[in-house]
From Swiss-Prot:
Transmembrane segments: none annotated. The lineage of its organism: Bacteria, Pseudomonadati, Pseudomonadota, Betaproteobacteria, Neisseriales. Pathway: Amino-acid biosynthesis; L-arginine biosynthesis; L-arginine from L-ornithine and carbamoyl phosphate: step 1/3. This is Ornithine carbamoyltransferase. It holds the Pfam family OTCace.
Length: 262
């Protein structure tokens, strides 16, 4: 998959440590096209000391890790976004004012994909109070939830899945969301998602429901919060929404810590 923040973060970090970096563009690589993942892994593992992979299938990054013989970092798959979790955990620790195992956060929106899955597992591992607010059809898979609950039993974490946004955000220290349509999905799914999620936007009113004057807003970016992008303008012209998963008022408010997070 294409990347802005994840690629830049890896490249800057590597160069800060004196490492060289090679970027293989999705359209310019033969990975999975003319050459299998297994063969690619064994070639790159002989040339490089580490590999960061950002793509679609979780199985692909796991196969790379199995055969490369060097550390492989998951820069994002459809299922998980672990390096973003490092940034999210650090950001919450910086802004919480209390230990993470005494911190509550809510994720609002489409919870089937990498961000909600990863936040669920992250929160469970850190013993946090995790709430997912989403239509039941857009909840994480039963397998992911079961894994998170098993971890939470050991760490003292709490996990709540609910269709009620007010229940999800009540008492929360942080409110997360993400885009409603992911990379690679066709435009045709927008209408369906908007119909399902129109009551799951992060608005000033929803932030206030937390009852926490210090509640913070988080988003891994990019966000559709206004009409200042081609997609944002298309959404406005097609569906009449100025801002989708989050309003401009919340995104640009003092409660927003998205750029610290990014």
């Amino acid at each position: 998959k294409t990347s802005t923040r994840t690629r830049c973060a890896f490249e800057v970090a590597a160069r800060d440590q004196g490492a060289g970096v090679t970027y293989l563009e999705p359209s310019a690589s033969q990975i999975g096209h003319k050459e299998s993942i297994k063969d690619t892994a064994r070639v790159l593992g002989r040339m490089y000391d580490g590999i960061e992979y950002r793509g679609f299938a979780q199985e692909t990054v796991e196969e790379l890790a199995k055969y490369a013989g060097v550390p492989v970092f998951n820069g994002l798959t459809n299922e998980f976004h672990p390096t973003q979790m490092l940034a999210d955990a650090l950001t919450m620790r910086e802004h919480s004012g209390k230990p993470l195992n005494q911190t509550a956060f809510a994720y609002i929106g489409d919870a089937r994909y990498n961000m909600a899955n990863s936040l669920l597992v992250l929160g469970a591992k850190l013993g946090m109070d995790v709430r997912i607010g989403a239509p039941k059809t857009l909840w994480p898979s039963e397998n992911i939830v079961a894994r998170a609950r098993a971890v939470a039993e050991e760490t003292g974490g709490k996990i709540l899945l609910t269709e009620n946004t007010k229940e999800a955000v009540k008492g929360a220290d942080f409110i997360h969301t993400d885009v409603w349509v992911s990379m690679g999905e066709p435009k045709e799914v927008w209408q369906e998602r908007i119909d399902l999620l129109k009551d799951y936007r992060v608005t000033p009113e929803l932030m206030a429901v937390s009852g926490n004057s210090k509640v913070k807003f988080m988003h891994c970016l990019p966000a559709f919060h206004n009409r200042e992008t081609k997609v944002g303008e298309w959404i406005y012209e097609t569906f009449g929404l100025n801002g989708v998963e989050v309003t401009e008022e919340v995104f640009e408010s003092p409660a927003s810590i998205v750029f610290d997070q990014a």
